[in-house]
Amino acid sequence: MKIALTEFVTLDGVSQGPGSPTEDTSDDFTRGGWLVPYLDKLFVRRTSDWLGLADGLLLGRRTYEAFARDWPQITDPNDPFTERMNSLPKYVVTNTLTEGSWHPTTVLRGDPIQTVGKLKAQPGRELQIHGSARLGKALLSAGLVDTLRLVIAPTVAGSGRRLLDHPSAPVGLRLVRHEVTANGLLLLEYERVNAAPVGEYEGVTAFV
């Protein structure tokens, strides 16, 4: 399977608490809900399309527990995400949980790079990481993430956990798709390349 990382971030890279002020208040974060004012039809359609590519969800413990609390409570039959989120196989990377309450769930214990690497080797389409910024950053630095999808909100949070705060290795990415919604969200899709390219600036004449 390919591993796809989907994250909602602000212009200053904050990924904490996009959905509401109370979604994630850890570390005294009080600025949640920053994504909601910009939601629109294109955002819903595109993120629903992305979720339709998943054969499983790969989550860190904190995100898993939040999703397990919230998603089973959504009963709106017109919600385009609920059925998929609740029915997909979930894999939670944790050394503290022994079982999961949000079925079907498999607990992945031990070294996350090794356990996820074994899971990635199985046949299938996409194993998708949603939220779980720490897990996503670790797997991205380890070269296990194939696709990175970002929804960037036109706002600056000023504080909160950042998606790519101090990655442990450089990561090369190639932009393969981009859209701008009517409310100003950037929808970006990247593929990982083998190495992060570098160069030396020799003036603008080479590009004129």
PLM region descriptions:
Residues 1-144, 154-208:
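Portal/gating segments that form or line small-molecule/metal binding sites
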